[in-house]
Design a protein with these regions (language model features):
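Non-catalytic, conserved peripheral segments adjacent to functional cores
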Residues: 1-107, 123-160
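Asparagine-centered strand-capping/turn motif at beta-strand->loop junctions
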Residues: 119-120
Length: 160
């Protein structure tokens, strides 16, 4: 190999929802990372979690996603609530849905304290997302989860 040219291995994770490439650009991004998810199925919802530190930036390279977003009570009064109990979050929250696709190119910025999740609308959807804090550094303390259906949301595709 030519001197100073290097090859870096990429972490791979797979489950029944998606295949993920984690920390794609490890070098030069010591505090942040870029991940890529290949979503196999349109039948699964991924999510309902928020981060206390991370901001995520989502971009659909191929396919389409229905993205659910909920502003948590903690986001409204962040300074008073350092230790969050997800059971105390008001379930009457308003779920907003955004749609990302390769036909409507945009980046969705998801700040801390916003619950988020998604369902692929097309099999084989590819989501590339940048996070401003490395997952391994903050994941133990940064990730708060509630189950799908917690907010009474409908992940279906409505007939119009």
């Amino acid at each position: 190999m030519i001197p100073h040219v290097k090859r870096h291995l990429i972490k791979f994770h797979e489950d029944d929802r998606a295949q993920r490439l984690q920390d794609v650009y490890q070098v030069g991004m010591q505090n942040s990372q870029i991940n890529i998810s290949y979503v196999n199925s349109t039948e699964h919802c991924v999510g309902w979690h928020y981060h206390t530190k991370q901001t995520e930036y989502w971009f659909v390279v191929k396919g389409a996603l229905k993205v659910g977003l909920v502003k948590s009570d903690v986001q409204m009064d962040e300074k008073k609530n350092k230790d969050v109990d997800p059971d105390k979050v008001v379930q009457a929250a308003c779920v907003e849905f955004e749609y990302l696709s390769d036909k409507n190119l945009q980046v969705l910025e998801i700040p801390p304290y916003v619950y988020h999740g998604y369902r692929a609308l097309i099999p084989g959807t590819i989501l590339m997302y940048y996070i401003n804090e490395k997952y391994e550094k903050v994941s133990k303390y940064d990730d708060e989860r509630v189950p799908i259906g917690y907010f009474g949301e409908d992940w279906g595709t409505p007939n119009k």
